[in-house]
Amino acid sequence: MNLPPLTPATLIRRYKRFLADCALASGEIITVHCPNSGSMRSCAEPGQPILISQSGNPKRKLPWTWELYWSGASWVCINTQHPNAVVAEAIAAGDIPALQNYAQLRREVPYGSHERVDVLLSSEGRPPCYVEVKSCTLLEEDGVIRFPDAVSSRALRHLGALTEVVRGGGRAVMLFLIGREDGRGFAPADAIDPAYGKALRRARTDGVEILAYRTRLSPDKISLSVAEPLLF
């Protein structure tokens, strides 16, 4: 997916989950919207370069949005609204072998108990395929990318909903999209959210398919890269 025009800045601090202060090249300090509810461990170090986009909506309280963070080795996707679009675009292009040959792709379709699946794939004569996408940015000291970066009851609930899809005769896929180019492999963050790690393993045993893919990032574009090994 193509990114909007981006402006360089330097991160000063991220606070109250959805706010960040940064300095523009001119020296002006502004507050930007941070579209990420996680802890953002390993991708919110003050003093690092970031890229921000400006909204054309005059009604927005904060016209700027934090899009990318420079880790020192890779750009990191901060905006959690992008992964779903990247995955949907890749599926439509046939770039994910496990999700090829479906006639219809729909996004944000209601299912389960008050849930909305990120992507629903369907074809006549085949069980529907429910795909949940999780954005992963946490890089641990061992070089492994992990999820979640904070305890997440919502992510846990999604695993339960996918398991129910399988029990009902459908196909369910949990796809972890790694929003950075450094690190290797994927595993659940057991030290941060042990309940999620246990639930992910249980869901896999119950028939939920687990995929992990890396992204290719630049100041202009985010696209699907290669599949990553599951290290659990």
Curated annotation (Swiss-Prot):
A Pfam family cross-referenced in the UniProt record is SfsA_N
Similarity field = Belongs to the SfsA family.
MF GO annotations? DNA binding
Q: Which organism is it from?
A: Acidithiobacillus ferrooxidans (strain ATCC 23270 / DSM 14882 / CIP 104768 / NCIMB 8455) (Ferrobacillus ferrooxidans (strain ATCC 23270))
The entry's protein name is: Sugar fermentation stimulation protein homolog
Identify the InterPro entries for this entry: SfsA, SfsA_C, SfsA_N
